[in-house]
Design a protein with these regions (language model features):
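Broad phosphate/nucleotide-binding scaffolds in NTP-utilizing and phosphate-metabolizing enzymes
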Residues: 1-180
Length: 180
């Protein structure tokens, strides 16, 4: 797990996918890789502040009364911080890692080249590495657009508004950007 963290966010995302594949790797490895879903080394808070300023066009102190420097969780693409709006409402702010889309696109391109050097295997049940990379990149692209995620939250909330046992997080569109 630590090795994947050191390689960077694309490899963390790959580890997250593998963590769900006990049919491919031993269960104890899956359990360790599950930590990559929320226990990745976080960005320094100073970098979080820069990301927020770039996304909102202003310092976080203009919008938030407070924000906790230590994230609630940190994963391959983003991390989340508990905060309080100036209005007094408690919120969670999700902050995308800086340059993550370019980093992941570059890593995927490099992995595709590397896979091209591997001779094709025809072992029954063997997973095609190109297929894994396609799945990885498709999943990552969906997660990289927080505006699309906001659309999905609103759609889920609307479709399930009459279902007692479901809930969707509140959303503040005025503070929602593609990266925060």
């Amino acid at each position: 797990r630590k090795f994947l963290e050191e390689l960077g966010p694309t490899y963390v995302k790959l580890g997250q996918i593998l963590s769900t594949r006990s049919d491919m790797i031993p269960k104890k490895y899956c359990e360790e890789l599950m930590h990559l879903c929320s226990d990745v080394e976080p960005m320094p808070f100073e970098e979080v502040e820069v990301c927020i300023r770039d996304a909102w066009g202003q310092e976080w102190k203009e919008v938030l009364k407070e924000i906790e420097a230590v994230p609630l969780g940190s994963a391959s693409i983003a991390q989340v911080h508990k905060a309080v709006l100036k209005t007094g409402e408690s919120v969670v702010v999700k902050v995308q890692r800086r340059g993550i889309d370019e980093i992941m696109a570059r890593d995927i391109a490099l992995l595709r080249k590397a896979v091209g050097y591997i001779p094709p295997l025809s072992i029954k049940g063997m997973v095609n590495p190109e297929m894994i990379l396609d799945e990885l990149w498709a999943a990552a692209k969906k997660e990289l657009d927080f505006l699309k995620e906001a659309d999905n939250i609103e759609e889920f909330a609307e479709k399930n508004k009459d279902v007692e046992f479901t809930a969707a997080p509140g959303l503040f569109r005025e503070y929602t950007t593609s990266g925060v």
